[in-house]
């Protein structure tokens, strides 16, 4: 797979291109090992320096990287015996939210998440991860199933927001989001939400109102996209960077506000740079958090979840 470089990664991309050029030349013009090693060290240093000082707008670009692991990648890398459940039993099946039953390190769980797709064809199938009412009603159905059988709920959040189309609104988009959020909050089983890329607006909250909320290091979580905020505040979507800088959408800001409980470190260069390592890190943290919640009663889980939401934004 060809590497997709972000705008701010252009200096790194230039160095990588020089390395590739020297590797090709070495096949016909002798060895350039010393030069290649020097350039690789320089690229590594530049990557470390760049990713150590990402601003919120840069993190937004990383969170949206097309090669970042998606829900289907986490399912393949972390779970076994996955059985997908489809449909909301009212209108149809929404492929923007996928979910079903699986085993996580041998234990049964219910999982669900937004799926954006990795290429043009799959992005259309999954509607770029923007769910319609059927997706949120499917999520409620899965959560009902989890509570009935006492299974933990694991959700993976990666969406720009709920789909704002006419049909979705006619079929009760706002009500479906509200019902899904309510069901998250009233679950009597352990629930953990992991924000893996974008966490956009109510479309994200609908499956992220969990007992524990985790967030990958370079993901974002906000009530509106930076472009949308810029359009509303300044009537100028080009000021998205200004909006991102002001909105407190990054993981450290959200931990400070008590919206997020824990940050999952990403490999150098972002989760897309080493997908296997990123997925493994998520699995290890999920196992720790699930173990901490597994001994609580349904009433204790509901109270702890309520307490964490009441504490959001409060000092102390």
Model-derived regions, located:
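Intrinsically disordered, low-complexity segments enriched in small/flexible residues
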Residues: 1-108, 276-316
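Terminal peptide-recognition signature
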Residues: 15, 55, 111, 158, ...
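Short hinge/gating elements
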Residues: 26, 60-63, 124-128, 269-272
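Short active-site-adjacent helix-start/loop capping segments
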Residues: 70-71, 119-121, 163-165
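Glycine-rich beta-alpha loop segments
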Residues: 91-93, 99, 104-156, 174-179
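Conserved catalytic cores of soluble enzyme domains
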Residues: 157-287, 295
């Amino acid at each position: 797979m060809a590497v997709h470089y972000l705008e701010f990664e252009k200096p790194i991309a230039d160095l990588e291109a020089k390395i590739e050029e020297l590797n090709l030349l070495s096949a016909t013009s002798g060895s350039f090992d010393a030069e290649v090693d020097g350039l690789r060290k320089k690229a590594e240093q530049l990557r470390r320096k760049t990713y150590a000082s990402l601003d919120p707008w840069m993190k937004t670009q990383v969170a949206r990287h097309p090669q970042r692991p998606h829900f289907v990648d986490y399912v393949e890398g972390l779970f076994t015996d996955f059985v997908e459940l489809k449909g909301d039993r009212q209108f149809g099946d929404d492929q923007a939210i996928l979910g079903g039953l699986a085993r996580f390190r041998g234990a049964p769980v219910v999982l669900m998440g937004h799926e954006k797709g990795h290429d043009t064809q799959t992005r259309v199938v999954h509607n770029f991860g923007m769910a319609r009412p059927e997706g949120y009603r499917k999520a409620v159905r899965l959560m009902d199933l989890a509570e009935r059988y006492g299974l933990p709920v694991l959700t993976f959040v990666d969406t720009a927001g709920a789909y704002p189309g006419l049909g979705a609104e006619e079929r009760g988009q706002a009500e479906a989001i509200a019902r899904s959020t309510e069901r998250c909050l009233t679950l009597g089983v352990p629930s953990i939400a992991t924000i893996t890329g974008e966490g956009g607006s109510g479309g994200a909250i609908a499956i992220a109102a969990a007992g524990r909320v985790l967030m990958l290091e370079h993901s974002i979580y906000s009530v509106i996209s930076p472009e949308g905020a810029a359009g509303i505040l300044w009537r100028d979507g080009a000021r998205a960077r200004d909006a991102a800088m002001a909105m407190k959408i990054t993981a450290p800001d959200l931990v400070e506000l008590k919206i997020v409980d824990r940050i999952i470190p990403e490999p150098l260069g972002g989760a897309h740079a080493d997908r296997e390592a990123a997925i493994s890190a998520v699995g290890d943290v999920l196992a720790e958090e699930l173990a901490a919640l597994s001994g609580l009663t349904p009433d204790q889980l509901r109270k702890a979840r309520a307490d964490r939401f009441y504490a959001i934004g409060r000092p102390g």
